[in-house]
């Protein structure tokens, strides 16, 4: 009887080990790849992204692409009207070292791709319906051979952000399944979080939850919340670059220190989508919580 029980135990352990070996593991997710938005005024959008921000436009799959570097870019949907009048965000995207393995890993967690793997990328929906695209590192991305723009006001996307209603549900996906890590959290009041930043598991870029938005946010409010951030070394130098690109309006020179201690400057595209210039490192102690991760730099672009 003891031999039978011992044999059964060994068989059970072997089966458990085999199942564990067969379970897909999550490959590295290294940073932000792109942010995609709708525009209802392509000509004005070109003046903003092309002239004011200084990025040179390319086209692929019916969209406008503005390379920030050879692995990060901004996408604009110009031919399809936004599905909602109060929102312009279409997708956020992150780079992975193995898109196929990540797709299998997410399927093993019950998350089916809405856009199956094709041309080095696939897309899923997070718990609140945001389209999240994962891009294969080293794939033939349209920006991979793009030369640096001489008028570019930044060469790094450091984070993307969007409105979140249920933080616990989002955490289960972004932190629990994808492995994103806490970076910083805070808000206008020290004891209430309006912004929660979580870094990619294998890099320094981050996703920012924008909390406490109320039941019916307007397009203007959504434009502030659903945003992307361009990293810069020096905000005064950025202001000079914007002036050189003929940036018009008070916002072109209006920098401030955020609650996280980093200098920032906000501009808005013709559809009221916010572009946040932000210095890579804080210049003073942050409010509300300490940073718990490494800050991005100009030289660690997501490749």
Question: Can you annotate each of these PLM segments?
Answer:
Residues 27, 33-74, 108, 120-123, ...:
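Core segments of cupin and vicinal oxygen chelate
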Residues 21-27, 103-156, 161-162, 183-200, ...:
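Vicinal oxygen chelate
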Residues 45-47, 99-105, 235-242:
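Short amphipathic alpha-helices within nucleic acid-binding modules
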Residues 30-34, 71, 87-91, 155-159, ...:
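Short, solvent-exposed beta-strand edge segments and adjacent coil->beta transition regions
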Residues 5-17:
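Bacterial N-terminal signal peptides
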């Amino acid at each position: 009887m003891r031999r039978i029980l011992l044999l059964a135990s060994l068989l059970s352990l072997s089966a458990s080990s085999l199942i564990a070996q067969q379970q897909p593991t999550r490959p590295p997710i290294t940073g932000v790849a792109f942010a995609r938005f709708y525009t209802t005024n392509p000509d004005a959008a070109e003046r903003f992204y092309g002239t004011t921000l200084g990025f040179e436009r390319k086209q692929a799959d019916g969209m406008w692409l503005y390379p920030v570097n050879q692995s990060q870019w901004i996408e604009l949907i110009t031919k399809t009207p936004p599905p909602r009048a109060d929102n312009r965000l279409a997708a956020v995207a992150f780079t992975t070292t193995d898109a196929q393995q990540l797709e299998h890993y997410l399927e093993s967690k019950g998350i089916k791709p809405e856009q199956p793997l094709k041309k080095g990328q696939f897309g899923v929906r997070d718990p609140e319906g945001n389209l999240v695209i994962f891009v294969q590192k080293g794939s033939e991305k349209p920006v991979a051979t793009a030369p640096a723009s001489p008028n570019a006001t930044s060469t790094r996307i450091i984070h993307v952000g969007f409105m979140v209603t249920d933080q616990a549900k989002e955490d289960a996906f972004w932190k629990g399944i994808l492995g994103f890590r806490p970076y910083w959290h805070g808000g206008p009041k020290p004891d209430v979080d309006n912004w929660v930043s979580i870094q990619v598991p294998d890099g320094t870029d981050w996703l920012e939850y924008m909390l406490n938005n109320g039941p019916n946010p307007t397009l203007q409010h959504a434009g502030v919340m659903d945003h992307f951030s361009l990293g810069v070394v020096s905000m005064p130098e950025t202001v000079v670059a914007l002036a050189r690109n003929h940036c018009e309006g008070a916002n072109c020179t209006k920098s401030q220190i955020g609650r996280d201690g980093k200098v920032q400057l906000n501009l808005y595209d013709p559809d009221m989508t916010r572009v946040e210039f932000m210095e890579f490192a804080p210049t003073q102690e942050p409010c509300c919580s300490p940073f718990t991760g490494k800050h991005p730099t100009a030289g660690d672009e997501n490749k």
